[in-house]
Each structure stands twice: as structure tokens, then as C-alpha cells.
């Protein structure tokens, strides 16, 4: 399902992210501008997204969401790589289609997480010896994703992926609603930076 970068209605313009509907049932509305009634614009966006099969709709962008509840808050976290503990685990770059399948399973319940139909650039499996313990994605100096496939191995997965970044500072985004991840990053001493994305839902 294709996204609509420019959805124009009588009351404004928005971008509709529809690609997550087939798997997650979620559509994302990014308000670009309102030149009439905000509620009128959102109502038109809702109608289109529902007709495309959306069960849940999340909102962001240039609008007043004070009457909405926060669905996901993505915060920048950072830590000098030298501050991370050593690990025997190793991250190995992969093009194996299993990566996308496992990623989608791991992040199915994480708000605003994307779905992969193919293996992206910078995809890694994390091994302890010959045992697969996790997966992740590295983009430059940022860990774009990390997931443990074995309970209690999140720290090892993170440290193994950190060895693959460019630069000396490990950067990542963390959904504040993903409490296990928040606890892990807090325990390692990651700083809390700016909120990069915030998504809302109707109350």
C-alpha cells in the first residue's frame, strides 16, 4: 500500500502513511498545514485511512493535539562508546530474509515502529558463538534498531551493535513507552536528549 505525501482536503493538507496498514492496521497522519478547521481536516484524513483499512490512526505534525493522548514519544539517547561494557557477542551484517520476519515479530507491539518487507541496509544478526541472540540495524553513528531474541541479552546485543557504528558516540531513538528498552539505556548511562517524534491518538 502506497503512502500519500500530499493529501489535500478542504481544511488543510497532510501526509498519510499507509504502508503499515496491511500488517499493523495502523495509519499515520502528519499534518502539514491547517487553513480551515483542524477537526475537519482530521475527519477527512480519518475517513480516507479507515477506507484503506486502518484500525488505529496516529497523528503528528503542525496541529494542536492538546486534546489527544500521547501514543508514542521517541527520545534521542546518546553515550560515548567507550562507556559501554565489553561483550563476547558479535554483530554480523546480513541479507537473510529471516531478519525482516524476526524484526517485525519483535517490534509488533512497539508504538510507531515500522514494518519491513525486505532486509534494509545495515541489518545485523547478533551471535554469542554460534547462537543467535538478537538483531539490529546500524545507520552511520545511530543504532536504528536493537532487539534481543533471548531474555536478558539486550545489553550484549546493544554492545555488539555499538561496535559497528561510525564515530565514537552511540546514538539511538527510544520510545518512552518501550519500558524494557528505557530501563536498559538508563542502566548503561545513556543521556536523554530532545524528543524527535511524538505521536498522538484520539482519547
Please describe what each predicted stretch is:
Residues 72, 132-134, 194:
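A structural microfeature
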Residues 1-47, 128-150:
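Conserved donor-binding loop and adjoining core beta-sheet/short helix segment
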Residues 30-88, 196-201:
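Acyl-donor-binding surface of acyltransferase catalytic domains
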Residues 1-10, 106-129:
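Active-site rim helix/loop that mediates acceptor-substrate recognition in acyltransferases
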